[in-house]
């Protein structure tokens, strides 16, 4: 008989850093959990946190059932309980679960039953709390819960495992994650533990020994530039190294020199690595307090005194799949309605990832967005469809999406607002400095720069004045001493005779690219 010893906080801390695995399942999940844990060795060095969809009105016996399938202790999670390696923790019924500093946090769900996404909620918190040590697993189940959680884990440098839909009793959740492109591994449940342990070992080796093989890393970066046209040499080496290691682990390669040769021999892997390096993590109204500060402290002054024929111009570089852009568009639309302003707002939303831009242009998002969008906003600005929610035309038509490399392509100009959140944290100081100057160049005098809470303008107090240090809102200052020496390396932009006037709507096509967009709407 297994004694269910729960680790104390001191014991958990003494065990050091270790991977934490979040497993989500719905219908058919019990069978999948059993098969999974029968193949997990007791001394595996990982903690497992289970988030099944449970009946909120009945006590759960899942811990007793799963204890038969593993030698590890299986316990029902308690509030503030620290997780420790070689242990299994199960969410209680009718509770929402997150993790903070390695300890379980429980709360009463705010959403009514049927609208809850407990797997997404936990995996998102796991990504934020554990970063590259987070592992997300989606098993059998209906619906889409877990898809956005896996996206957060991948964006934080973690790894995701999804049950092969052909082996799942219900394939809805696995299929959703795979179709969205958020599955690092797609495997039958029985094969997951071995692959998970191998991946954890490979990533641990690379984490403890950051990329020191400069020649191999340079060969990889040069190959990426030659094949994709994009230079990642000014991205932080730790970030690049982790993402290369994640691709290496999928091919059971532990040596970067070997992986460099593998890339040269397998051109398709170059594209896979390129997609791996594209940081694509976003959500509607991410950091709600920051959006509240923008709405209360910045936008009213920005709107004040604008005539009806004014065109307020917003650029969202690194827009990913468009949630941030549409959040800003909704926020501005609401405030304009409340204050009686009737000028036009035009968004230029750009990203390097062609697939992400395709999702943004379609403006259709999964049902999971109910976690991030208030019910009144869902009803006002979205149309419910079979696959999720579509952004309404009145918001969608404000935005032009285009493919752009913000690092090498010239910036837009004469902008009122630049919103670039969670991109510069991945850049080396020199490139970060160039980008801050580029944003200053792009903004009108008094224009606003909106960054994420983890970013800053660095040592550029001569270019920007803080509006909110907490929520990283800055006003561009264009004094005589302010430097505006931005030298873009891409093609120069000039006015074309057939350019549309600023207030005229831009026709959006599937093929809209930055160069074409520039000719039509920039000047």
Predicted regions and their residues:
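PAS-family sensory modules
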Residues: 2, 478-523
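Conserved beta-strand signature within the Rossmann-like core of class I S-adenosyl-L-methionine
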Residues: 445-453
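Glycine-centered, small-residue-biased loops immediately flanking beta-strands
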Residues: 158, 345, 447
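Conserved acid/base catalytic micro-environments in cytosolic active-site loops
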Residues: 1-277, 484-493
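A short glycine-rich, Lys/Arg-flanked "PGG" loop and its adjoining helix->strand segment in the class I
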Residues: 432-445
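Class I S-adenosyl-L-methionine
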Residues: 233-241, 248-315, 325-331
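Extended basic-aromatic, gly/pro-enriched interface segments that bind polyanionic ligands
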Residues: 317, 338-417, 423-429
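Conserved SAM-binding loop of SAM-dependent methyltransferases across substrates and taxa
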Residues: 321-339
């Amino acid at each position: 008989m297994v004694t269910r010893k729960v680790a104390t906080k001191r014991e958990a801390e003494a065990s050091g850093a270790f991977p934490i695995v979040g497993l989500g399942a719905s219908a058919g999940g019990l069978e999948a959990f059993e098969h999974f844990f029968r193949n997990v060795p007791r001394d595996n060095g990982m903690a497992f946190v289970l988030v099944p969809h449970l009946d909120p009105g009945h006590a759960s016996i899942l811990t007793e059932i799963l204890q038969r399938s593993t030698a590890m202790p299986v316990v029902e999670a308690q509030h503030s309980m620290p997780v420790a390696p070689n242990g299994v923790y199960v969410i209680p019924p009718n509770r929402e679960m997150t993790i903070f500093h390695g300890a379980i946090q429980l709360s009463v769900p705010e959403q009514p039953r049927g609208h809850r996404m407990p797997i997404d909620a936990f995996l998102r918190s796991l990504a934020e709390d554990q970063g590259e040590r987070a592992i997300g697993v989606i098993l059998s189940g209906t619906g889409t819960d877990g898809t956005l959680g896996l996206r957060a884990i991948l964006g934080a440098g973690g790894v995701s495992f999804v049950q092969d839909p052909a082996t799942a009793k219900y394939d809805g959740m696995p299929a959703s994650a795979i179709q969205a492109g958020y599955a690092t591994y797609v495997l039958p449940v029985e094969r997951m533990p071995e692959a998970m342990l191998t991946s954890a070992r490979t990533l641990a080796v690379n984490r403890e020994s950051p990329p020191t093989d400069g020649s191999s890393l340079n060969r990889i970066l040069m190959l990426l530039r030659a094949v994709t046209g994009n230079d990642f040499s000014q991205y932080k080496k730790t970030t690049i190294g982790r993402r290369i290691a994640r691709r290496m682990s999928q091919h059971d390669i532990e040596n970067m020199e070997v992986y460099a040769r593998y890339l040269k021999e397998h051109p398709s892997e170059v594209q896979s690595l390129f997609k791996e390096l594209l940081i694509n993590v976003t959500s509607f109204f991410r950091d709600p307090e920051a959006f509240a500060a923008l709405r209360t402290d910045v936008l009213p002054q920005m709107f004040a005194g604008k005539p009806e024929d004014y065109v307020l111009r917003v650029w969202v570089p690194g827009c990913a799949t468009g949630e941030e852009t549409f959040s800003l568009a909704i926020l501005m639309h609401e405030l304009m309605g409340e204050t009686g302003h009737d000028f036009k707002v035009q968004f230029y939303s750009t990203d390097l990832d062609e697939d992400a831009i395709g999702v943004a242009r379609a403006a259709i998002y999964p049902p999971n967005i109910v976690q991030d969008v208030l019910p009144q906003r869902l009803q006002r600005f979205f149309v419910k469809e079979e696959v999720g929610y579509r952004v309404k035309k009145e918001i969608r038509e404000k935005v032009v999406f285009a493919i752009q490399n913000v690092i090498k392509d010239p910036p837009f100009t004469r902008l009122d607002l630049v919103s670039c959140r969670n991109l510069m944290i991945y850049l080396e100081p020199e490139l970060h400095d160039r980008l801050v100057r580029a944003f200053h160049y792009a903004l009108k005098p008094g224009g606003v720069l909106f960054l994420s809470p983890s970013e800053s303008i660095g040592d550029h107090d001569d270019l920007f004045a803080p509006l909110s240090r907490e929520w990283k809102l800055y006003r561009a200052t264009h004094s005589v001493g302010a430097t505006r020496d931005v030298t873009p390396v891409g093609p120069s932009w000039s006015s074309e005779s057939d350019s549309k006037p600023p207030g005229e709507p831009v026709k959006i096509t599937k093929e809209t690219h930055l160069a074409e967009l520039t000719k039509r709407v920039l000047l």
